[in-house]
Amino acid sequence: MENTKKIGNLTELQCMTYLYGLGYSISIPFGNADKYDLILDINDKLYKIQIKHSSEYRDELGEAEYVKFKCTWQSHNTSGYTRTQYQENEIDYFATFYNGKCYLVPVNECANEKILRIKPPKNNQRKGISFLEDYIAEEVISKL
């Protein structure tokens, strides 16, 4: 991929295709002034989704350990660039795409970035750890 915009666009297409393939209606806002990338219609309730590209991180053996994405948006003004966290009144979920699946993470579970573990930490800590498998789109949607 040549640049981050193309990478982001590909992630958006992958998430949209995945969610549409599950049978859900998707609406895309006109322009790029909205904080969300799509509206997902689930049982006549609308959810604002912000799609983020996630990066994979590997352990010393080269095995996938976790994925991470930013939970902020960047804007530019006369002072330079600033990063701002998304708020619960702006979006409902972040979506990301990894290894052939779409994942949905509630905005209230995110701060500046979100780490989703693929395998447990070496110390086997579970408290305060988010596991990728807990955010598979179908599973999250089934609980709505």
Residue spans of the language-model regions?
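Catalytic cores of nucleic-acid endonucleases
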Residues: 52-103
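Short acidic/glycine-enriched loop/turn segments that link adjacent beta-strands
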Residues: 32-35
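Short low-complexity stretches enriched in small and charged residues
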Residues: 1-9, 46-59, 136-144
